[in-house]
């Protein structure tokens, strides 16, 4: 604590904060001209005046009150009424204050604050961005225009200040010096309608703060943006220097015909003129090391970056230097840069291809201007189309020997576009593009025709209104998607149904009720092989609970491996009639089934989930005589599949795609059995044939946020299976009358026909389609069944476990059965 006591006042500073005693006011005195509403403060320092005491009567002065508003009053006014001000001129004065309190003559027009005669004033502002350094009697911000005269200085903010430092201004014209001394990008924010450097001695230093200027005019002098961010609506660059080191500067528009200032982009700095989407991502893809910085980003030390979404035409004296080593004088390593355009090692120029036509992105003022591009300088040409010529720079002197970089790995564009930089004697730097074949760049990709056509027809556009083209274009642009994610993302979306195991799960749930029917009609399912049993003439009612779990792995899908895990559960209920049929017994019946399940992808596709429901019906019949049994069935099964697939969030498309797919199976089969009874085991060889027509309906793959990506045509597979096997069983009768029959069945199941599904896919708006075949089942599988059935009187129960195995697939199932004989 510091105390200064005299006979008139007690002044207390506690932890840097002024404690004004009751009845005291901090004031500065000015001389007013009522005719012009001009108030002049000359050689003043704030004083603390007691109640009833004028500014002249106080001899307690304090030059620094950054936490206090200072009232501008008449020197002899004991009431300390605010002076009416239209123009406030401060000369020969040095002091710091939070702000000045005045009575504005015209609130709409505001007040002009004019610093002259070597004044050095520091003002802080308030807590919000609409605060002011001039306020009225109610502490409301007064619109403030500022002129900092040659030799004078205005400082906004204090680097060591603990509080927020914010204010808005009208026009601020700097002929002397303006310093923004910030204490952080979030806590120091100043906004300007216009910020203008208009004198050769003008110096503007914007440090550790966030700056917003609707208009900035650079005529003379220097504007230095240091460890700060600046957002400029319109820049009028007719002279002077704009130096950035390190900082982020965003310039929405350029006014005037030419760029007559020197733009020096220094160490770690980023300047964006116009707008380029996802610029920070592009910087990373080009090999720089960006890091978020306020409302923008900077790059690593030793790097520098300029992004042009609008063309720049250099005027007389205009210059662009992008090099981490440049200083505010425009020299690198102490040597002044003589070129009108200079791009150093580890610099990055990002150019929107839309401005790289005609005179190009950067146009020289005359052939006397030179351009240098160092060997390790990089160029990112955004959204370039194939078979085009893009002008990066034009109008310079001979560029053939001074432009070394911007080629090879230092030239970045769309993945399916070849680009070559050409620097010629005509003073231009151009990039010529040709199309790469998708199948060459990405062997095994599923949609090469679609990609080649889109690129060849120059349809690629990362902001296209066509969702499919936008998706494909973004997947091919490095800033949206890492190289290793391109094929999984494109192929997964183009093969959504296959990635979600639609065909496989449809076949599996269609086969489950067939297995239940065949078990029900099998000789091996008759618990009693001698005498009366449940299968005498009359009506049987039976039901099975079914559960299945199937795993598929390592199916080839172009350059990817595909697989999925599928689980389902459901039930089958049936009824049939047994009757005499010549020398044997005949049976006919009807069964219904229903269930639900889900499939989750595994392997290289992006994560895909299929939630499905299924239902079906079967007509079946059989004929048996002694040890011979023939079973036949005709069935229909329908599935509804709800598919969702994750896509990388970096695409900016809400991270998910979806599709609804209907699928079905019509199946017919015949199975013949022959039972050989022995005292030890009953041995029953069996053979069969089964036909399946597997249909996958056409569907549309969409973004979860809306918009069609792909249309997939319907497909019909014709599959034949030829199971051959043997069943081993034995009936055991207990003293209580229960009959127990354990059994085991082993089969081999060859398959023929369309064991692969055909996928025909196209993107709406692209005049091409792609076709591919993907395996759904192996050509040979092995089937094992193990179970037990118990029966007493007219009731039978059963429990079974089955397993299917092949090279790429493993399935397991559990059935629980019940039958009642009427």
Located regions from the model:
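Extracellular beta-strand/loop-rich repeat segments of large surface/secreted proteins
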Residues: 1-3, 8, 67-71, 79, ...
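Extracellular, surface-exposed repeat/solenoid domains
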Residues: 2-22, 27-32, 42, 106, ...
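Feature marks extracellular polysaccharide-active and adherence modules
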Residues: 5, 14, 19-21, 29, ...
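Serine/threonine-enriched low-complexity regions in disordered or flexible coil/loop segments
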Residues: 9, 37, 45, 58, ...
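A composition-driven surface/loop motif
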Residues: 16, 26-28, 41, 60, ...
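N-terminal segments that cap or nucleate solenoid repeat domains
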Residues: 20, 39-98, 103-105, 544-546
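Outer membrane beta-barrel translocator domains of Type V secretion systems
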Residues: 472-678, 683, 798-819
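Outer membrane beta-barrel transmembrane domains
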Residues: 618, 622, 677-678, 693, ...
